[in-house]
Amino acid sequence: EYYCCADAAGFERQIIEDMDRAEALGAKYAVFHCADISNEEVLGNYALHTNEEIIRATASLINRVMRGRKYSFTLLFENLFVPGMTLINSAETELMLSLVEYENKGIMLDTGHLMAALRLNGLLTAQKEEGAADAILNVVAAHWRVKKHILGIHLHKCSLNMPIEEYTKVIAPAESFEERSAQSYARIMALDAHSPLETDAMRRVIDAIAPRYIVHELSARTPAEKAEAVRMQLKSLRGCCP
C-alpha cells in the first residue's frame, strides 16, 4: 500500500529507477530517508523496530540496489524523528555510514527533524531558536568522528511550542488506509511544520558544519507563499527583522 508494489523486489526496482533517473538528470546528490514507521505506529505512539534494526535494514537495502552500479552523485542519508537514523546517538550514525558500501556517501542534516527528535527525547525544552541552535550544536559536537560527512543541511524549524504530550497522545485509527494516512500526516506535520526561521541563531550551525549544500525546505500552499517563506528565512539569517 505504501509504495504501490507487491513485494520487496518491487520496492528495490523503484529505488533503482529513482537512482537511474537522478543520474540521467545530472544530480549532484540524492537523498534517502533512513526511517521506517507505519500509520498505526504514528497514531498509537509506539515503534515496532529499533533505530539499529532500521539502520541495518536500510544499509542492507542500499547495498543490494547499488551493488554493481556506478553513479556519479553523492548519496546523502537524512535524519528523521521517527525510528531510524535520528542523529540523537552518534554511534548509530557511525554505524549507518560504516555499513553502507557505496563510497560516495554522506549525511543530510535536517534541522527541523533534529529539533523534533530532540524534543521527543527530552533534550530540547527551549521554545526559542537560540536554544534549538545550542542543542543542534551539541549533536554536531558529538558527531566529531563523522562531522566531515555532513555535506548538506535542510534548513527550517519544527514547532517549538507544540506540547509534546499533544503529539504523543494515542489517536484511534480510521478504518481505511487513506484516512489513516491523512491522520498520521496531520499529526506529523503539526510537529514537523517546516516553518521559516525567524532569527539568525541557526547561522552558528551553518558555520560549524560548513555544508556543501543548503536547502530552504519550507512548507507552503502556493509557489508565491513558498517564495515569501524563503525570503523571510534568508532575511532572518542575515540578522534582519522579518
Which ranges hold each PLM region?
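Histidine-acidic metal/acid-base catalytic patches
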Residues: 12, 26, 102-109, 115-242
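Active-site acidic/histidine proton-transfer and metal-coordination neighborhood
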Residues: 1-106
